């Protein structure tokens, strides 16, 4: 059966939840088509979800002909849902494959993107930005974003373990009182305002109430630059602590860097396909 609507169908497993020991188990998976190939009475498709790749094998006699024929006609990047049975297979990259019994094609590609999701590098940044969601499906960028998320979680966990209070300070301010970097002016209810370039003043005041505070949030700096690596908008990790001196703060920052490096090294160890180099 082939349908195009999600309906009541829901994913039962992600790719990393499945293994060969589940032989004979019925599952429902969803993702984007990575590759498709056919050989006579058999069609193969690799489907990628957020955690990895899945092998879909449609063989004449094992699944409905309409599903086998539809899989062979799919183009890369089409989004699909597949219900089928796990079959252990030494030939499959993950040790198993899925024999489909139901296929749903949620969206089918009509124009082939200018690069493959398996590409390690794409030189033209404009090309990448035109199809950014597809660009971000590339393995290296998946690991970059997951590592970034891990580092932010690790830092937030550290602050929580040390009894810091997380705060959220205003990002639109009435006056340019922070000094230093140039500010972005904006109109706020027909009055001039600015995007905040630092939470420093708010942090200092809040330590008089909570002693230990931190914030992970955007900052904005209107500084002209001739390099394309300069960020006018960035994520800042700020902390403030009462009753300590400069050396205490530096020790705190060193601890944050240490726990972050440990977390990243563990990630690299558990994900060798990231091709990242661990820090000694």
Residue ranges: model-predicted function:
Residues 1-280:
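Class II aminoacyl-tRNA synthetase catalytic cores and aaRS-like
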């Amino acid at each position: 059966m082939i349908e195009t609507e999600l309906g009541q169908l829901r994913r039962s497993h992600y790719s990393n939840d499945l293994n060969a020991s589940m032989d004979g188990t019925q599952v429902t998976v969803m993702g984007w088509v990575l590759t498709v190939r056919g050989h006579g009475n058999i069609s193969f498709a690799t489907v990628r979800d957020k955690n990895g790749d899945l092998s879909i094998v449609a063989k004449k006699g094992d699944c409905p002909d309409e599903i086998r024929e539809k899989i062979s006609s799919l183009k890369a990047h089409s989004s699909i849902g597949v219900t089928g049975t796990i079959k252990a297979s030494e030939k499959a990259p993950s040790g198993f494959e899925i024999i489909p019994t139901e296929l749903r094609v949620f969206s089918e590609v009509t124009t082939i993107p200018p690069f493959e999701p398996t590409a390690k590098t794409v030189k033209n940044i404009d090309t990448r930005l035109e199809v950014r969601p597809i660009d971000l499906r590339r393995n290296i960028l998946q690991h970059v974003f997951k590592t970034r998320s891990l580092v932010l979680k690790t830092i937030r966990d550290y602050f929580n373990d040390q009894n810091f209070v997380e705060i959220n300070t205003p990002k639109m301010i009435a006056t340019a009182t922070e000094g230093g970097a140039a500010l972005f002016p904006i109109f706020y209810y027909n009055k001039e305002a600015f995007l905040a370039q630092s939470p420093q003043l708010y942090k200092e005041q809040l330590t008089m109430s909570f002693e230990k505070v931190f914030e992970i949030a955007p900052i904005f700096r209107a500084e002209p630059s001739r390099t394309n690596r300069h960020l006018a908008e960035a994520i800042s990790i700020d902390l403030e602590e009462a009753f300590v001196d400069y050396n205490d703060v530096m020790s705190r920052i060193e601890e944050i860097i240490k726990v972050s490096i440990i977390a990243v090294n563990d990630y690299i160890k558990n994900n060798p396909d990231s091709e990242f180099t661990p820090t000694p």
